[in-house]
Amino acid sequence: MDKVIEKWDEILQTVKRDYNISDVAFNTWLKPLEVYDVTDNVITILVPSEQVVLINLLNKKYKLLLQVTICELTGISECDVKFISPDEAPQ
């Protein structure tokens, strides 16, 4: 988990650069995301409450890009990304 958290900003910047994501899209969709948990190679990412309705869009547009980049930059051989809302996050 520490590797993903330590490298989170680098992961986001790499996704932006490698996949030519515009500043507007990056600041809207990716920058607000936070790593919530890493368990058994599942990286759970917390989506801000104002973006919860867009979890499906994040899954369609950015999930695979994040998975590939996380694996490349952390050395994790295989990982999955799961987006959750603040309501789904255990307190």
Model-derived segments and spans:
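Intrinsically disordered, low-complexity basic tails and flexible linkers associated
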Residues: 1-91
